[in-house]
Structure formats: structure tokens, C-alpha cells
Amino acid sequence: MTDYLLLFVGTVLVNNFVLVKFLGLCPFMGVSKKLETAMGMGLATTFVMTLTSICAWLIDTWILIPLNLIYLRTLAFILVIAVVVQFTEMVVRKTSPVLYRLLGIFLPLITTNCAVLGVALLNINLGHNFLQSALYGFSAAVGFSLVMVLFAAIRERLAVADVPAPFRGNAIALITAGLMSLAFMGFSGLVKL
């Protein structure tokens, strides 16, 4: 049980996909202007990452390895991600049309989010079992969502703050992201993996 807790804390805080591994920067910068949109994108990405991790592990373990088709791993995982994203898009469209309109083009872009593919590939490379794969996918998504929501809240505050003209817009957003990354580096001694 301790191993699973360490995996969760380590993935969310210490090895955060956005601030440490620099995966998923496109939605991090693009969807984080409003808190509601960032929360919606975080929830959708959490669902997709967790389900993709589970499906990718199952396909790799039950199909690719037994048939010696490991060279098709990346292609198979991209296909799994596309199917899961389409399923998520249908669910969001039916359950929350407002969120569907808010996310706009960013929902289909989860397919090309490198963090989702990165989670699937890292699960296999790290040799995780089924439960560890599911937890790793969920933890990576929670870390992604946490950082997105924090960044969106900060950006909303910066929108009304008195920022010098050269730093307005993306410049202050990048500086803020760098400061957040430095803050998350403080967690690096928390978990030794």
C-alpha cells in the first residue's frame, strides 16, 4: 500500500508531467486562461489518461507482447488514445453541452497531447503492473489537472493586475510557469523512487 501512495505522491508532485517532464505544455498554455475551462480540461484529461493507461497496458500485455508486435506499440497506443478521446467527446457532449462549447477545439486536441502518449509509453518502460499502470495514469492526470487549475487561477489574477507593458500576455504567463516549476522542485526530496 505504501508503494502505491509513493507512486501517487511522486507522480503528482515530484515528477509532475507539465512542470518536470515538460509534457502537455500546449493545453497547459492554451486552456489555462479561465478557471472553468482549465477545470473542465483537467477532468477530461484525467478521464482520458486513466482509461488510456489501462487500455494501453492491456493491449501491450495481451496482444503486442504475445504476438511479438512490440514495434507497433506507439501506433497502437495512438489508436487507443484516439478511440478514448472520441468516447470522451461523446460523453462530454451529452452530459455538459456548455463544457463542450467551452473546450471547443481543445477536446479533440487531447488526442495529440504528448502527455497522454507519454503516460502510456512510460507505464510500459517502467514495468508497471495493471494496478500501477492505472494509478500512474490517474496520478499523472491529477498532477496535470492540479497544475492547470493553479496556473489558470494565477492567470486570472494576472489579467486584472498591474503588469508592466513588456510582460503582459504570454510573457508573464511563461514567467509564472517557470516560477511554478521552481516551486514544484521543492518537492523533489519528498519521495525517493
From Swiss-Prot:
Family listed: Belongs to the NqrDE/RnfAE family.
Residues forming coiled coils: none
Major enzyme class: translocase
Recorded topology in the membrane: Multi-pass membrane protein
NCBIfam families reported in the protein's UniProt record: PRK05151.1, rnfA
Keywords: Cell inner membrane, Cell membrane, Electron transport, Membrane, Translocase, Transmembrane, Transmembrane helix, Transport
GO CC annotations, alphabetized: plasma membrane
Keyword Acyltransferase listed: no
Highest taxon listed in the record's lineage: Bacteria
GO biological process: electron transport chain
UniProt-annotated location(s): Cell inner membrane
TM region positions: 5-25, 39-59, 63-83, 102-122, 134-154, 171-191
Subunit structure: The complex is composed of six subunits: RsxA, RsxB, RsxC, RsxD, RsxE and RsxG.
Function: Part of a membrane-bound complex that couples electron transfer with translocation of ions across the membrane. Required to maintain the reduced state of SoxR.
Enzyme Commission numbers on file: 7.-.-.-
Pfam families according to UniProt: Rnf-Nqr
InterPro entries: Ion_transpt_RnfA/RsxA, NqrDE/RnfAE, NqrDE/RnfAE_oxidrdctase
HAMAP family tied to this protein: RsxA_RnfA
Protein name: Ion-translocating oxidoreductase complex subunit A
